[in-house]
A protein has these predicted regions:
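Small/aliphatic-rich secondary-structure junction motif
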Residues: 30-48
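Histidine-anchored nucleotide/phosphate-binding helix
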Residues: 17-30, 38
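Short, glycine-rich nucleotide/cofactor-binding loops
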Residues: 5-20, 48-53
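Acidic, glycine-rich active-site loops and adjacent beta-strand->loop/helix elements
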Residues: 9-11, 42-46, 81-84
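Short internal beta-strands
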Residues: 24, 36-42, 75-79
Length: 117
């Protein structure tokens, strides 16, 4: 089974990203062969910035994305969205990478389920 998560919201300020990134590793835990891809778009690309510092006791989206990667998932970012926000490849957390609409289209076609947050 392949699930694609498309995340549009900023990493903090709403709980959409938080909830998406809680569900992604839960799917892999229930089904170890489950393939998860997280595609970050719009303000969602900010979720993959390296070295996030959140208050003690507050969730950290970078750590949550690392759990996706540890479960053999992928974290892809819309390159156009990155450019619009002045985010460079060097600012990304390890394992996350710039992507394209063509790759998103291919990933969408290959996915069994697509969840949009």
């Amino acid at each position: 089974m392949k699930t694609l998560f498309i995340i549009n919201d900023p990493p903090y300020g709403t709980e959409r990203v938080y909830n998406a990134l809680r569900l992604a590793p839960a799917l892999v835990k229930k089904d170890p062969g489950h393939e998860v891809t997280v595609f970050l778009m719009a303000d969602g690309v900010l979720a993959a910035k390296a070295n996030q510092k959140t208050p003690e006791g507050f969730y950290n989206v970078e750590r949550m994305l690392k759990r996706v990667l540890a479960g053999k998932g992928q974290v892809l970012l819309c390159g156009t969205c990155m450019d619009a926000r002045g985010i460079t490849d060097a600012e990304l957390m390890q394992g996350a990478r710039r992507s394209t609409m063509d790759e998103l289209a291919d990933t969408t076609i290959a996915a069994d389920k697509v969840l949009v947050f």
